[in-house]
């Protein structure tokens, strides 16, 4: 996963002149919910990205000896306006790509309102909404986690393989709950 992330970033950076705006450094954004409902998960996600950036920088072979400077922003996971503002701040600060965001709703808002209009690549490690599969991204949005639609199909198949004839579905009444457990599983199980 780490090598894939580095490879995608390097490929994208090779086509952008903004990558070298401060000499040798390449500014990369990390936007995750450092505050909010998943704040306990995000430090490890950010540290993983920063470690990948460090390894790429320390190799000495990143685009002729360039290094990556990580810049963090808080998506909050829950507040799309705050996440978009944070992402725009990173973009205004010169980042050429963003690792994040994390939660699907805020990821969609950041992609639609900040990253895509500014031509900044996003790679989300955890946004799983099926709607992101068909986002009009002009080639700027990627994710490493599969869509909830696929997860629902797999869960339904496992349930059917175990000869379960009926199920009761409970879920959190928000986009994540509906996508992940309600619609995707329910549609695939029927």
Predicted regions and their residues:
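Signal peptide-proximal N-terminal region
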Residues: 47-70
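Extracytoplasmic ligand/sensor domains, especially the bilobed periplasmic-binding protein
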Residues: 92-184
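Structural motif
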Residues: 66-92, 150-154
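Short, solvent-exposed loop/turn and secondary-structure capping segments
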Residues: 40-43, 83, 110-111, 134-135
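Immediate post-signal peptide segment of exported/extracytoplasmic ligand-binding proteins
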Residues: 19-30, 61-67, 160-166
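Short, low-complexity disordered leader/linker segments with a strong preference
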Residues: 1-27, 92
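C-terminal intramolecular chaperone/auto-processing assembly modules
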Residues: 52, 183-190
């Amino acid at each position: 996963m780490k090598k894939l992330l580095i490879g995608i970033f390097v490929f994208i950076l090779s086509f952008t002149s903004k990558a070298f705006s401060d000499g040798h450094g390449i500014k990369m954004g990390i936007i995750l919910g450092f505050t909010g409902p998943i704040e306990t998960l995000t430090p490890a996600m950010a540290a993983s990205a920063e470690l990948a950036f460090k390894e790429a920088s320390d190799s000495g072979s990143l685009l002729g000896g360039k290094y990556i400077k990580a810049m963090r922003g808080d998506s909050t996971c829950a507040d799309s306006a705050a996440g978009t503002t944070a992402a725009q701040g990173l973009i205004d600060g010169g980042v050429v790509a963003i690792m994040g965001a994390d939660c699907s709703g805020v990821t969609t808002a950041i992609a639609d309102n900040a990253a895509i209009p500014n031509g900044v690549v996003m790679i989300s490690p955890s946004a799983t909404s099926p709607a992101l599969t068909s986002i009009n991204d002009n080639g700027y949005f990627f994710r490493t986690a599969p869509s909830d639609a696929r997860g629902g199909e797999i869960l339904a198949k496992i349930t059917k393989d175990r000869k379960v004839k009926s199920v009761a579905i409970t879920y959190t009444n928000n986009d994540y709950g509906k996508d992940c457990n309600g619609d995707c599983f329910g549609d695939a199980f029927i």
